[in-house]
Amino acid sequence: KRQLLARLAGELGEKQWLEDRVRYTTATEAAKLMRSSSPSGRRDYVDGKKEPKKIPANRAMQWGHEREDHILSEASRMSGIAIEHNHQVAVKSEDTRFAATPDGIGDDVVAEAKTFNIKVTDFLPDQYFYQMQWQMFVCNKKQCLYAYEVHEDYKPVVDEETGSSVHYRIIDRDDAVIKAMVSEVELALEQMNEVKESSDQIDDLIFKLAIA
């Protein structure tokens, strides 16, 4: 059973949001680590935890936020899969270091909504695939209802066959991929602990020299 923080993600103040960024490994972070699978990627992860920063909103992000509810509702109707829209942070009950915020949650499924410019040719980039795998891992689900809408200059493009601007795919959980992702995250967490221990030792040395 998933554990949900008693707090809506949309209601988080910047201070609390930054604290959560330090406390948990999110789906976005886990996906980036998996794509990189390198020491430099782990350094970026550690740096992000040391000095978390808000991602500045842009037009594309705002459009995605505005269209999210419609995309999920339409994908639910088209697929016949019942989902509830979600704005809460899910924390894995077996390991509270890991968290995710899927856009929707159903009985045995999570849901993720995206928007794409019509010029895009890859509607399932690795970053999104790994992100959904992490969401299924955290929420203990077997599938993800992946819904996306194509637009041209922020005007939805309706598909002639379906009569809808929304498309969907069912993404199955891949435990082998999840295992590899957890391994990458564990390596990054080990590196972060080493950096913290080194920093603590330096602080102790400075303190001892100061009082000597």
PLM features: residue spans?
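Charged, glycine-rich intrinsically disordered N-terminal tails and low-complexity linkers that flank
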Residues: 1-66, 70, 211-212
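A generic signature of intrinsically disordered, low-complexity regions enriched in glycine/proline
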Residues: 24, 48, 107, 176-178, ...
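Short, well-ordered alpha-helical scaffold segments within catalytic/effector domains
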Residues: 68-72, 129-132
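C-terminal accessory segment of soluble enzyme catalytic cores
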Residues: 204-212
